[in-house]
Amino acid sequence: MSESTTTIETAWLAIGQIVAPQGLRGEMRVNPSSDFPERFLIPGPRWLRRPRQTEPEVVELERGRAIAGKNLYIVQLAGITSREQAEALRGCELLVPASDRPELDEGEFHVLDLIDLSVIDQASSTPLGIVRDVVSAGNDLLVVELTDGREVYIPFVEAIVPVVDLAQGRIEITPPPGLLEL
């Protein structure tokens, strides 16, 4: 998995959302939508998109750290020094330029590339649905909207998802009995 899609064209990748202030000195909790922790740990420029805004503004990440046992990061942005200032940023998205996408190893994919791929039953070539999201868990789960409108979670493991063909816009699956009935 990797960064999630964002509603701002394809020039930006959403890497997380500010969910709450942390403490009294302007730190914030961020719910990541990126599998690349350096996005929250290494100081440097990031971009902030406020709700109902289309253009992001540049911000400087001063420092960040992971919260042990939780899928959250604590970040400090330059100029944010109080809990009230941090609270005002609740709901904002942190972004990076799409050109900052890290190179991936064979068999790894960016979430943005998986969204909207067709899902096909490999044995019968029957169209089953469309990938709508990817959820991080022990193994990543593909959130698939089936052709009948139901939503199912498909483990994103090679035994069940042997083919990901980005060029053809499709994923082939070999679902075990009962997986699509859950």
From Swiss-Prot:
Q: Which domain of life is it from?
A: Bacteria
Instruction: Indicate the secretion signal residues.
Output: none
Mind naming one GO cellular-component term on file for this protein?
cytoplasm
Show the GO MF annotations: ribosome binding
Which HAMAP family would you find in this protein's record? Ribosome_mat_RimM
Q: Which family does it belong to?
A: Belongs to the RimM family.
Q: What is this protein called?
A: Ribosome maturation factor RimM
Please tell me the species this chain comes from: Synechococcus elongatus (strain ATCC 33912 / PCC 7942 / FACHB-805)
